[in-house]
Amino acid sequence: MQRKDAKTIIMYYRSIPEMKRLLQQERRELEDEYCGLHGISMDGMPHGTSPGSPVESAVVRLAESGASDRIREIDSRVQVLEDDQRYIQSALDAVNGRYKIILTMRYINGYSWGGISARIGAPDSTVRHWDSKALLRFGKALEDAGETGEILGRATRARV
């Protein structure tokens, strides 16, 4: 695997938590939009905002809008993101400690080369050289685990 592909995948890994958060927020909004139950009144019975059975009307609105399909799609996308996150994390864990630190600091935590150099206690040029090697080792770890092509495709589409 080339360094640019490994970099694309690790940047995708960095963005997975935000992507999951946005999908879960969209799911909550869809559920809130079609849930007519706003609370329980003082008599202990649920009361909705629409006439008839509140659950019935919510199910009808949900079915008519296609929101249930979108909710299922969101759930499957979140599951794919979680699987990708575990897969990439396991490949990152397979990389040597020094290289893993550089990859984590640079691509996940967003440190500058100078910041990494100061934290590690090595010259800037050495840190850049180690980064180059780290990306190659990370790419090799991804290839050894399999499924790299699919994840690279999703990572490339996510970065567009």
Protein language model regions, located:
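Short amphipathic alpha helix immediately N-terminal
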Residues: 95-111
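DNA-recognition helix of helix-turn-helix
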Residues: 120-144
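N-terminal interaction/assembly modules
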Residues: 1-91, 114, 140-160
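Hydrophobic positions on the alpha-helical face of helix-turn-helix-like DNA-binding modules
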Residues: 103, 115-118
